[in-house]
């Protein structure tokens, strides 16, 4: 008999704060839908409330997920997305754009409040049950990595019978402090400390992250916890039947996706585009950067503001619905991902699943994400090599790599590995209690 599975959906509960889902949100959403639909035992969701951490039943959770997908516009047509229309207009026209008009902005407080109300209306008002009353030997699964929020997980210290399994997506602020602000470093230290104290097992998205957990500056217990490595699949939203936008089929543009963080190395791309404009003028392809603003974004926006010559060729936007983002990726010449470091690299597999080639940094996590796909790996700090590779697309539409028949990993296969890991952990726990 399977134990009760309590899946923490704190990231999704906070979803109305943002325009669209982040990569981690997509992972948590996939976990939620899978286990709510397929876990053979009882499955409940854990979220923060005004009354503390509470858990709720399947039916209420499903209503909440449906409401959140509507808030995030996960099912709309790209043609109904105003952000997509603006981006397409920029790509297809030759006039100078007011790039600042596209710049990512925080969601206004009134819209956040409105969308929280929409989420509450979707689920219905309920008090739920205290996490302290979860059934004995339940499995607690947390994949959102909001583990620095100690009050949200401190209850685990009072329930040693609970099998707590955390997903660690990366520890980049600790590994690359020069590319992160002090707050991010402090939060990651809290994540490490809380994980070492409260986790009973770990899930990681790459062998690169598994290696990171073994570094000497981390608590020794992290390296001894049972750890399952399972490479992430493409979000289901990127696998639905879809067609390219015919108006973009001959457009010359590249795309970079993900949070606008210092470690993503967008500065290199801007340096490359400045050089491309100097060399090729109006024949320079356009660069679309689709992502959220972060606390380390300022140098990116300052660079663009200080170099008017690239205003016709570079645009930054956030708030694109997932269908719209996918449509933009589908017609791009290539996806660009020059990150200094990553825990995995979701945009790589999202692009490969659309048949779009990738230029990526030659780092372990990128190699894992791009295995079997048309990926050209380049030094993360060599702007000249990146410029040459981008220019090569003007001569060869497939870039420097060979055309491959990339087969995306399926979530069903992914969860076979995850469920086998949870089953083994559960069996070991029950054996210890006998």
Question: What residue spans do the PLM features occupy?
Answer:
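Carbohydrate transferase catalytic cores enriched for Leloir-type hexosyltransferases
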Residues: 1-434
């Amino acid at each position: 008999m399977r134990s009760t599975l309590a899946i923490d959906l704190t990231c999704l509960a906070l979803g109305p704060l943002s325009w669209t889902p982040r990569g981690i949100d997509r992972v948590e959403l996939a976990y939620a839908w899978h286990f709510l639909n397929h876990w053979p035992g009882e499955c409940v969701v854990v979220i923060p409330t005004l009354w503390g951490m509470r858990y709720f039943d399947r039916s209420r959770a499903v209503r909440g997920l449906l409401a959140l997908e509507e808030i995030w516009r996960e099912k709309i047509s790209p043609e109904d997305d105003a952000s997509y229309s603006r981006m397409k207009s920029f790509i297809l026209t030759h006039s100078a754009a007011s790039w600042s008009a596209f710049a990512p902005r925080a969601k206004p407080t009134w819209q956040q409040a409105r969308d929280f109300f929409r989420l509450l209306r979707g689920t219905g008002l309920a008090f739920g049950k205290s996490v302290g009353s979860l059934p004995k030997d339940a499995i607690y699964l947390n994949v959102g990595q909001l583990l620095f929020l100690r009050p949200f997980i401190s209850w685990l210290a009072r329930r040693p019978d609970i099998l707590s399994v955390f997903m660690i997506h990366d520890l980049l602020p600790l590994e690359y402090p020069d590319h992160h602000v002090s707050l991010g470093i402090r939060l990651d230290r809290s994540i490490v400390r809380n994980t070492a104290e409260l986790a009973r097992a770990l899930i990681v998205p790459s062998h690169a992250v598994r290696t990171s957990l073994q570094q000497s500056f981390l608590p020794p217990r992290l390296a001894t916890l049972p750890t399952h490595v399972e490479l992430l699949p493409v979000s289901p939203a990127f696998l639905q039947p879809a067609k390219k936008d015919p108006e973009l089929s001959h457009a010359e543009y590249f795309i970079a996706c993900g949070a606008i963080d210092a470690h993503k190395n967008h500065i290199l791309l801007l340096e490359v585009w400045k050089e491309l404009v100097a060399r090729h003028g109006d024949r320079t392809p356009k660069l679309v950067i689709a992502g959220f603003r972060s606390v380390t974004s300022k140098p990116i926006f300052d660079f663009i503001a200080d170099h008017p010559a690239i205003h016709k060729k570079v645009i930054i936007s956030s708030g694109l619905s997932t269908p719209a983002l996918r449509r933009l990726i589908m017609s791009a010449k290539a996806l660009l991902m020059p990150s200094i470091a990553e825990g995995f690299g979701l945009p790589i597999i999202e692009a490969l699943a659309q048949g779009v080639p990738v230029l990526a940094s030659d780092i372990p996590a990128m190699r894992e994400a791009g295995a079997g796909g048309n990926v050209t790996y380049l030094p993360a700090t060599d702007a000249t090599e990146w410029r040459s590779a981008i220019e090569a697309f003007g001569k060869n539409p497939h870039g420097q790599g060979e055309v491959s028949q990339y087969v995306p990993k399926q979530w069903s296969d992914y969860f076979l590995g995850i469920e086998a890991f949870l089953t083994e952990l559960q069996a070991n726990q029950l054996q210890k209690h006998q």
